[in-house]
């Protein structure tokens, strides 16, 4: 599905508003129906979106919302730097190794990274979108931290978690 759970959305909004100025650059990976733009776009003005499934870009008018919309697989997308990168309901759609590569690439290209995932959630093709298949349907709080040691839990409950970039540096980026 092109949308995500409502859990903690307002908390994420407040967290980012408290931490960052309005003029930052945000990358919303897996833009879907534009949930994070709708959540943040009235405060932060420079938000780019990445969406692999072209019909979502057209059906949800993403090009009228985001500063830039990239119709590309995040595994192949190369970018320089964003203040915040949001992976909202994205990594569960990638094999573990691919998700690890994507997050490792993003780690040194942002000040903050937000990763939102559903726990233990099977999903197949939705609305003719093969990219909706969950390849990590076994995600839990425990294996999220094992698979992605660069992240730490920010908000969560028994069915959904928001993770943020863990500060793994001592004066210089090390990942």
Report each predicted region and the residues it spans.
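Hydrophobic adenine-recognition pocket in adenosine-nucleotide-binding enzymes
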Residues: 90-93
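A conserved beta-strand element that flanks and buttresses the S-adenosyl-L-methionine
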Residues: 86
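Conserved beta-strand signature within the Rossmann-like core of class I S-adenosyl-L-methionine
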Residues: 110-120
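Conserved helix-to-beta-strand junction in the class I
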Residues: 105-109
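A short acidic, helix-capping loop that chelates divalent metal ions and anchors anionic groups
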Residues: 122-127
């Amino acid at each position: 599905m092109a949308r995500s759970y409502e859990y903690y959305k307002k908390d994420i909004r407040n967290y980012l508003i408290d931490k960052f100025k309005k003029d930052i650059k945000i990358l919303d990976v897996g833009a879907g129906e534009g949930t994070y733009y709708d959540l943040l776009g009235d405060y932060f003005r420079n938000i780019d979106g990445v969406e692999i499934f072209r019909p979502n870009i057209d059906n949800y008018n993403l090009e009228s919302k985001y500063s830039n919309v990239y119709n590309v697989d995040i595994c192949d997308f190369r970018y320089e730097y964003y203040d915040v990168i949001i992976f909202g309901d994205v990594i569960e759609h990638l094999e573990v190794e691919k998700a690890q590569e994507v997050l490792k690439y993003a780690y040194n290209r942002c000040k903050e990274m937000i990763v939102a995932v559903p726990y233990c959630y099977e999903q197949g093709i939705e609305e003719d979108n093969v990219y909706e298949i969950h390849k990590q349907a076994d995600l839990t709080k425990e294996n999220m931290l094992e698979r992605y040691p660069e992240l730490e839990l920010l908000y969560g409950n028994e069915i959904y978690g928001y993770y943020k970039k863990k500060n793994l540096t001592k004066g210089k980026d090390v990942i």
